[in-house]
């Protein structure tokens, strides 16, 4: 695989310090690759294996290879990009391999789309009790294309898009693509948790704000919005004629003890009819390369407006991979949620015991941790650098400099919080969708960096 895309796996492993990682987590001898899937069982003692460190280096991965290209041998572990390091389940791999054995790649027929939509609807009903009409499901190559089509249909260029921040950084690229402007309502952060600033949110629902991008669960803060919160958001949007675009790509990844409320499941029909929902299971099974998502609305008028701007353009293997996940993945997801909940608890306990100066937002969902480095960022010199260079043509934020500093001091790449809008300037996002042994190495390394200032 590596040769076919111009990457040398062993060179990357050596150059990036990945052999040191292998030794640290006990998965291989120095100079050898981490587990690459050959002869490694998918189950251990009847359970799916999330503990084996799976080697992604040399596969063209943004999370690893792109960081190595940027930082060279300074980086040990990529903990920024939001895809998990777990091995793709066998039922997805086998379905794709079976299709690959048919050596023709003609156009996918309409019948396949019908069956695929029915599979998606069954997943929604079985896991969330939500009845979705399969004929209303619009297949897309990702959540972003669906959001961009919707913004173009519902907002005019130069108008504002309402965001509750810190929020998913990808939304800002959607705004650039649609020539719309950000309208950021910063959430309130108190006692390690974020809540909506209701007065500010409503004040921003001005006539030039026609749509709101809602993230549920919220990336990066991990909020899983309650039915009460969603109804209140929906009531305000209905009152001020703002359409809700609900990005629910992380909806399968809710922590134990919490429950997701899909926007389309709200008990107020008028609120639901003022919305579109956007989903995918590419985060759940770490298959974003399959380029597959869907959106829908219970309002045929909104659906028709957006469909004018929408193109499906999906590929056959994407349908095969996602259909296999929907049909066979429930048990795998159930075990994944238990493992991720353990990772969240591990991070919380570790920070409390070893790095109390690092602020921790207790996540209710996603496989992401949102960390506050206020004083540490100041001591690292990142704030001073940002201030000194603020008049540059392309100024960098303090968290941007701090990302570089963290790689230099610890070998761990985290995403800088400035990307996530107002309120994220002194924060970093850490992906914990990895083996717990990798997580321990990363936290130990971050602790060493924190202790150095």
Please report, for each region that a protein language model flagged, where it lies by residue.
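Helix C-cap/helix->beta junction micro-motif
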Residues: 178, 239-240, 410
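PLP-dependent aminotransferase-like
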Residues: 152-214
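N-terminal small-domain helix-loop-helix segment of the aminotransferase-like
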Residues: 39-142, 149, 327-328, 453
């Amino acid at each position: 695989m590596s040769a076919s895309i111009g990457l040398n796996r062993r060179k990357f492993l050596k150059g990036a310090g990945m052999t040191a990682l292998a030794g640290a987590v006990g998965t291989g001898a120095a100079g050898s690759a981490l587990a690459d899937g050959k002869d490694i069982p998918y189950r251990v003692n009847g359970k799916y294996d999330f503990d084996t460190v799976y080697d992604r280096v040399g596969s063209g991965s943004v999370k690893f290879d792109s960081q190595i290209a940027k930082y060279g041998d300074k980086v040990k572990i990529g903990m920024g990009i939001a895809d998990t390091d777990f091995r793709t389940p066998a039922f997805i791999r086998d379905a794709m391999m079976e299709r690959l054995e048919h050596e023709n790649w003609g156009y996918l027929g309409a019948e396949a789309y019908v069956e695929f939509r029915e599979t998606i609807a069954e997943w929604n009903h079985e896991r969330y009790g939500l009845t979705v009409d399969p004929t209303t499901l619009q297949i897309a190559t990702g959540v972003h294309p669906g959001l961009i089509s919707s913004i173009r249909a519902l907002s005019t260029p130069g108008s504002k898009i309402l965001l509750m921040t810190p929020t998913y950084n990808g939304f800002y690229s959607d705004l650039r693509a649609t020539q719309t402007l950000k309208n950021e309502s910063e959430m309130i952060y108190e006692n390690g948790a974020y809540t909506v600033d209701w007065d500010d949110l409503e004040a921003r629902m001005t006539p030039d704000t026609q749509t709101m991008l809602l993230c549920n669960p919220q990336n990066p803060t991990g909020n899983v919005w309650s039915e009460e919160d969603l109804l209140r958001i929906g009531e305000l949007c209905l009152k001020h004629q703002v359409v809700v675009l609900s990005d629910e790509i992380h909806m399968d990844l809710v922590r134990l003890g919490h429950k997701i409320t899909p926007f389309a499941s709200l008990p107020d029909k008028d609120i639901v009819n003022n919305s579109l929902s956007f989903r995918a299971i590419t985060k759940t099974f770490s298959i974003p390369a399959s380029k597959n998502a869907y959106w829908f609305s219970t309002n045929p008028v909104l659906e028709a407006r957006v469909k004018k701007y929408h193109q499906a353009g999906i590929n056959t293997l994407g349908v095969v991979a996602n259909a296999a996940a929907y049909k066979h993945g429930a048990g795998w997801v159930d075990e994944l949620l238990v493992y991720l909940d353990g990772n969240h608890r591990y991070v919380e306990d570790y920070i409390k015991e070893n790095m109390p100066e690092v602020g921790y937002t207790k996540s209710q969902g996603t496989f992401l941790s949102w960390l506050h480095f206020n004083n540490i960022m100041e001591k690292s010199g990142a704030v001073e650098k940002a201030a000194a260079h603020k008049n540059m043509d392309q100024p960098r934020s303090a968290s941007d400099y701090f990302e570089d500093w963290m790689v230099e001091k610890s070998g761990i790449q985290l995403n800088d919080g400035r990307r996530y809008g107002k309120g994220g300037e002194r924060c970093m996002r850490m992906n914990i969708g990895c083996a717990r042994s990798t997580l321990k190495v990363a936290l130990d390394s971050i602790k060493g960096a924190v202790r150095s200032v």
